[in-house]
A protein has these predicted regions:
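N-terminal subdomain of lithium-sensitive/metallo-dependent phosphomonoesterases centered on the IMPase/IPPase/PAP
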Residues: 1-127, 299
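Generic C-terminal helix-cap and adjacent flexible tail
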Residues: 2-5, 183, 306-311
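Residue-level signal for inorganic ion chemistry
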Residues: 21, 25, 50, 61, ...
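Generic detector of well-ordered alpha-helical packing
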Residues: 51, 55, 74, 129-132, ...
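DPxDG-like acidic metal-binding loop motif
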Residues: 121-184
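Short helix-loop capping/hinge motifs at secondary-structure junctions, enriched
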Residues: 176-179, 184-185, 213, 300-303
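An extended, acidic
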Residues: 192-311
Length: 311
């Protein structure tokens, strides 16, 4: 039986949690040194700040929904006594796939489970405690906290807090998506809307994974096709923020492959709740188990899909 949750109350509480984590990250950045950076894989970094932020978030989310499990990027939830299904997961309630098996060229877990699957809880938090770690290290905006709540394959809540601009993007299923900001007169909130740009005037974000060898044919085809034929192309270094920028109409489309569920899950709901379109690279709207995302205003979705399918 599906569990009934007060999604509005839960979402606003998650916004507060994300802001607290963001305040921690902002404070630690003022005293951060490169000596504290670790390499997970080639060009893929993690710091004590990622792990500290994740512990803060997991602790608060456990209090909010004690029955929920976790998919987290840094794998701290299991250390603190809560099952952490780090890595690629089945989201149909039947089980969770481990991350201890073979890696693809970009370091992400393959979709084939290396071990027998274990039962998954009906509710899962998907957490990226610091999306855009390389940006953070270099003091280059944006970087963000990303938190999503799943029930089966359905994304119920998405919250992304951009630390440098102090903007919290959020959505809960069926209501729309919003952004809140702290201003002199207090906290303000406004509804988000995707753009209405067509492909010839579109501003696209084409992200490169940290190890892009396997992605070179696709990104080359994307750039060769669209460079000079769209408004412009950008890279921003944060999947969560690229999705939020699409939702806010600041970008018209975004495409990336070889990314984790924590990178895109929250932002994808935010895009969809504004009327945008999100699929994987095959064009499937059942993108929650994959490692590729295309998100657009809906108008240019087929333009991007046609190119990635032919790469």
């Amino acid at each position: 039986m599906e569990q009934k949750i007060d999604l509005e109350r839960c979402t606003l509480t998650v916004c507060e949690i994300a802001r607290r984590a963001g305040a921690y990250i902002r404070e630690e950045r003022s005293k951060f040194s490169l000596e504290s950076v670790e390499r997970k894989h080639a060009h893929d970094y993690v710091s004590y700040v990622d792990k500290g932020s994740e512990r803060l978030i997991v602790s608060a989310l456990r209090e909010l929904l004690p029955e929920a499990g976790f998919i987290t990027e840094e794998g701290t939830a299991d250390i603190e006594g809560t099952t952490d299904f780090e890595g690629t997961t089945d989201l149909d309630g039947t089980g969770v796939r481990g991350c201890g098996g073979a890696r693809n060229d970009c370091g992400r877990s393959n979709l084939v489970p290396p071990y027998p699957r274990t039962p998954a809880p009906p509710l899962l938090w998907v957490v990226d405690p610091l999306d855009g770690t390389t940006n953070f290290i270099h003091q280059y905006a944006p970087y963000a906290v990303s938190i999503a709540l799943l029930q089966g394959r359905e994304v119920l809540i998405g919250v992304v807090y951009e630390i440098c601009a102090d903007e919290c993007f959020y959505a809960w299923k069926g209501v729309g998506a919003f952004v809140s900001r702290s201003e002199q007169r207090g906290m303000t909130s406004e509804r988000l809307h995707v753009s209405s740009q067509k492909i010839q005037d579109a501003l696209l974000c084409l992200q490169l994974p940290y190890n892009s060898d396997a992605y070179k044919p696709t990104i080359k085809r994307l750039i060769d096709t669209f460079y000079g034929n769209v408004g412009s192309i950008r890279m921003c270094g944060s999947a969560a923020m690229a999705l939020c920028y699409v939702a806010a109409g600041r970008l018209d489309g975004y495409a990336e492959q070889y990314i984790g569920q924590w990178d895109y899950m929250a932002g994808s709901l935010i895009v969809m709740e504004t009327g945008g379109t999100v699929t994987d690279y095959s064009g499937s709207s059942d993108f929650t188990q994959g490692n590729s995302v295309i998100a657009t205003n809906g108008i240019i979705q087929q333009d991007l899909l046609t190119v990635v399918k032919s790469a």
